[in-house]
């Protein structure tokens, strides 16, 4: 059963009593003085037979990955392990979020063969846990929900033992479109808040904090395991991060990821600061104390980073009712 949100922890107080001089976020309000990344942000460079095989698989099946389109720093590690987060509905987004490297513009026509190719790629990679995401397709009547459903069903048919995690857009808050995705029965429903409420407009101008929360609450109300993620380094304050974690816990979200924002190009939102590994540990401990089941928090953490391990920990706590999760 879910750990209840501790009533004994008043808002604004740290339930772990770890705040103080040793854990003070002294750089929280200070802008980044140098473009040089700290040592803890060094990621594995692409290379090796696993990386080559994954790249060939993606290219041969004419697939898109968020690893490439979003310039994920973990691409080298994940592809070397033979895993990739596949991105459906093309690689051009109808939104223009200021943190995201994915191209914005007029999307191409729908590729009706994409669901089958995605399912085959999951089989070829022999994934026990796959993560599927997409661009936003606001120009479509259903926001792409029907393609989402077709993809989930194709993966399930071809790979009945694979846990399916979906990372979806907000479908402009249309819960009927969210239901189309949920009716296809993914194992984990992920939708990212991305940042604190105050910074929604400068970070992702076409989204809303309350709308994203409503999507997550709706999925939870239907009995699905839910997941969300936020970034540090876009101008947030410590109290705002705490408030966001409290909101996530109040929405009974099961899994939370917290990572460092990295500026994709000079045209994107600048990095306000480099959060330290100690700060990521602080927020992980706070999230767990508030009752969030699984918290993955670290400078290089992204939504799909070690997602299989997150779902295994979730299943290990006896949460959820999807037997597939136990094999992830």
Describe each region flagged by the PLM.
Residues 13-85, 120, 126, 150-162, ...:
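Auxiliary Fe-S-binding modules of radical SAM enzymes
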Residues 31-41, 77-114:
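Canonical Radical SAM [4Fe-4S] cluster-binding loop centered on the CxxxCxxC motif
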Residues 73, 94, 197:
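Nucleotide phosphate-binding site architecture
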Residues 101-118, 122-177, 181-217, 227-231, ...:
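Core AdoMet radical
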């Amino acid at each position: 059963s879910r750990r209840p949100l501790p009533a004994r922890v008043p808002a604004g107080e740290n339930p772990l009593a770890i705040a103080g001089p040793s854990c003070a976020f002294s750089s929280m309000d200070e802008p980044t003085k140098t473009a040089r990344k700290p040592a803890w942000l060094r990621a594995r460079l692409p290379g090796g037979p696993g990386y080559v095989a994954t790249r060939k698989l993606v290219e041969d099946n004419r697939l898109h990955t968020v690893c490439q389109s979003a310039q994920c720093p973990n691409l080298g590690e994940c592809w070397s392990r033979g895993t990739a987060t596949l991105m459906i509905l093309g690689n051009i987004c109808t939104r223009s979020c200021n943190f995201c490297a994915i191209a914005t513009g007029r999307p191409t026509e729908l590729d009706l063969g994409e669901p089958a190719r995605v399912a085959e790629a999951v089989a070829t990679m022999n994934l026990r846990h796959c993560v599927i995401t997409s661009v936003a397709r606001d120009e479509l009547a259903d926001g792409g929900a029907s393609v989402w459903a077709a993809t989930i069903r194709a993966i399930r048919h071809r790979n009945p033992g694979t846990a399916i995690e979906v990372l979806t857009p907000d479908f402009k808050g249309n819960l009927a479109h969210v239901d189309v995705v949920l009716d296809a029965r993914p194992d984990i429903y992920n939708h990212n808040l991305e940042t604190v409420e105050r910074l929604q407009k400068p970070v992702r101008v076409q989204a809303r904090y309350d709308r994203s929360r409503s999507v997550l609450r709706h999925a939870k109300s239907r009995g699905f395991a839910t997941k969300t993620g936020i970034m540090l380094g876009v101008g947030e304050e410590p109290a705002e991060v705490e408030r966001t974690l409290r909101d996530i816990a109040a929405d009974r979200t099961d899994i939370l990821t917290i990572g460092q924002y990295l500026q994709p190009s000079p045209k994107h939102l600048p990095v306000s600061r480099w959060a330290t590994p100690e700060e990521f540990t602080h927020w992980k401990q706070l999230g767990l104390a508030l009752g969030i089941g699984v918290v993955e928090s670290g400078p290089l953490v992204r939504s799909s980073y070690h997602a299989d391990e997150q779902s295994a920990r979730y299943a290990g706590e006896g949460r959820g009712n999807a037997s597939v999760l136990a094999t992830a």
